[in-house]
Amino acid sequence: NDMKKMIAYSSVAHMGFVTIGAFSFTNEGLAGSVYQMVSHGLISGALFLCVGIVYDRLHTREINAYGGVTDVMPNFAFFFMFMMLASVGLPGTSGFVGELLVLVGIWKTYPIVAIFCATGLILGAIYMLWLYRRVMFGKAVKEEIVSLEKLSKREIIIFVPITALIFI
């Protein structure tokens, strides 16, 4: 039920993926591991920033305390969705490149492990998108949600370069 914990679990999964790529002992796997580490640093940092922004406004990280944030903070919803999609490996983002290279590298040496990794990626995407849906969608009925402040110019200025770096 804690947004920060969910993102932290995602980080652990991504580092496991980096390890698998490194131990594939292929050029693709090693390159994918390095790319995934850099990408993960940007994306996870941005996701923790997203949690910090809503925590600063509501003083809770509990998923159940949110819902309907999209109606009140549309710019935030865009950036949070982009970071979530980059985290799950949306094509066109740095998350995709690293994950694809690791999968190609591990497929060359251990195809069965690559199948398990691909399954793990799908399950990871499911729980990250579940988190996004629970926090962002629904009807903004709670007074705390309805009164949330939109992103400030300073916060948008922070998000824009991070978003640009996550694109390939």
Segments predicted by a language model, with ranges:
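Short helix-capping/hinge motifs at transmembrane helix termini and TM-loop junctions
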Residues: N1, S24-F25, H59
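Transmembrane helix-loop junctions and nearby membrane-interface residues
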Residues: A22-F25, V88, Y132-V135
